Design a protein with these regions (language model features):
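AMP-binding/adenylate-forming catalytic domain of the ANL superfamily
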Residues: 261-282, 300-304
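Acidic/polar alpha-helix N-cap and adjacent early helical turns
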Residues: 290-304
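Gly/Ser/Thr-rich phosphate-binding loop
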Residues: 24, 49-54, 63-127, 141
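Active-site glycine-centered loops adjacent to acidic/histidine catalytic or metal-binding residues
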Residues: 82, 106, 134, 178, ...
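Beta-strand->loop->alpha-helix junctions that form or flank phosphate-binding loops
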Residues: 102-109, 134-136, 226-228, 270
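Conserved AMP-binding/adenylation subdomain of ANL enzymes
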Residues: 1-3, 11-51, 65
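Adenylate-forming AMP-binding core of the ANL superfamily, especially NRPS adenylation
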Residues: 84, 117, 123-167, 171
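AMP-binding/adenylate-forming catalytic core of the ANL superfamily
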Residues: 52, 159-161, 172, 177-264, ...
Length: 304
C-alpha cells in the first residue's frame, strides 16, 4: 500500500487514527508536525504515496498553489474530512490534478469515520450526488430524525444520528448537532449545524451557507461566520475572511448579494491576514467570536 503521509496533528482523531491504522497494518508512515505545502510536497515526491488525506484548508492550499501535476503523479486518490469541502473545490482539484477527492464524515466521539465515498461509488455516482459525504461505512448506521426523535424519510432534513461501527453491534444511536438529509440510496448530505444557527430578527441563517458563498469567490482562501449579539435583532451574522488575491468588502458583499437572501448577508466582513485555526485545520470559531467581541460594532449594514 506504500508509505502514508500523516499531516494531521495527534491531538485530533484524524491524526491518531491514521497512526494507529499504520501501526496495525505494519505500514510505514511519515509524520509531519503540521501541514506546510513545501514540506508536504517534498514528502510526496520522495515517498510517492498512492493515497493522501488532506483537510479542506490544506486541499485548497494545494489547489491554489503553482504545484505542477507531475509532482502529484503517484497519488491516485485524496480523502478529505474534518470540515465541509465544497463540491466546486473538489471538482476543481480533480480537474487540475486528475485525482478524485473522496469526502468523508467523522467525529472524535465516533472514534473516527462513519461515512465516506469509495472510489467505486465516486466513479458511478459523483455527478448526480456531488456534495454528499458518501454512504455509511461498513458496520455503521445513520439516520435522520426530527427533534422528538421520530425517524424521517429519504431527503427530509433533520438531526443526524449515528451508530458507529467502532463501538460494536450493541451501540445505541448517538445524536449529533449536524443537520442532514439521506437519500434513498443512502448518500448523506450535511446541510449545517443545529447549534450554530443564527436567528436574525426571526430569520434563520446557517453559517455554513454564508461561509460557502464567501469561499466561492475566487479571491477568498477561507472564511468563518459567527453570530454577534444585536440589541434590536437578537443576533446578526459577521464574517472573517482570508484572501488569496486582492479584493474588498464591497466586492465580497456584491458577490453575496447574487447568492444569498438579504438577511443572510453579514453585517460586517473583516479581512484578515490569516484565519485563526485549530490544530486540526478547522477555523477557530471561538477566536473569531472573540475578535468581533473586542471590536466596536460597525454601523454599516451590508444587508441593506
Amino acid at each position: 500500500r506504500g508509505v502514508a503521509i500523516v499531516n494531521s496533528p495527534l491531538v485530533h482523531i484524524g491524526g491518531v487514527f491514521r497512526v494507529l491504522q499504520c501501526v496495525a497494518e505494519a505500514r510505514p508512515f511519515v509524520l509531519l508536525e503540521r501541514f506546510e505545502l513545501n514540506a508536504w510536497t517534498a514528502a510526496v515526491r520522495r515517498h510517492r504515496p498512492r493515497a493522501v488525506s488532506l483537510v479542506p484548508a490544506a486541499l485548497r492550499t494545494v489547489l491554489h498553489s503553482d504545484l505542477p501535476r507531475a509532482d502529484l503523479e503517484s497519488i491516485q486518490v485524496v480523502t478529505c474530512g474534518t470540515a465541509p469541502l465544497s463540491a466546486d473545490d473538489a471538482d476543481a482539484f480533480t480537474e487540475k490534478y486528475g485525482i478524485p477527492v473522496l469526502t468523508s464524515y467523522a467525529a472524535t466521539e465516533f472514534g473516527g469515520g462513519v461515512a465516506g465515498w469509495t472510489l467505486a461509488d465516486h466513479r458511478r455516482y459523483w455527478r448526480v450526488k456531488r456534495g454528499s459525504v458518501g454512504r455509511a461505512n461498513p458496520g455503521a448506521a445513520l439516520r435522520v430524525v426530527a427533534e422528538d426523535g421520530t425517524p424521517l424519510g429519504p431527503d427530509e432534513i433533520g438531526l443526524l444520528e449515528v451508530k458507529p461501527g467502532q463501538l460494536g453491534p450493541d451501540a445505541g444511536w448517538l445524536r449529533t448537532t449536524d443537520m442532514a438529509r439521506i437519500d434513498a440510496d443512502g448518500f448523506v448530505w450535511i446541510v449545517g449545524r443545529a447549534d450554530q444557527a443564527i436567528i436574525r430578527g426571526g430569520f434563520k441563517v446557517m453559517p455554513d451557507d454564508v461561509r460557502a458563498a464567501l469561499e466561492s469567490h475566487p479571491a477568498v482562501a477561507g472564511a468563518a461566520v459567527v453570530a454577534r449579539p444585536d440589541p434590536r435583532l437578537g443576533e446578526t451574522p459577521v464574517a472573517m475572511v482570508e484572501l488569496r488575491a486582492p479584493s474588498t468588502t464591497d466586492a465580497l458583499v456584491q458577490h453575496l448579494r447574487e447568492r444569498l437572501a438579504r438577511y443572510e448577508i453579514p453585517t460586517e466582513i473583516a479581512i484578515v491576514d490569516a484565519l485563526p485555526r485549530t490544530p486540526s485545520g478547522k477555523a477557530d470559531l471561538a477566536a473569531v467570536r472573540g475578535y468581533f467581541a473586542e471590536r466596536p460594532t460597525v454601523l454599516r449594514n451590508h444587508a441593506r
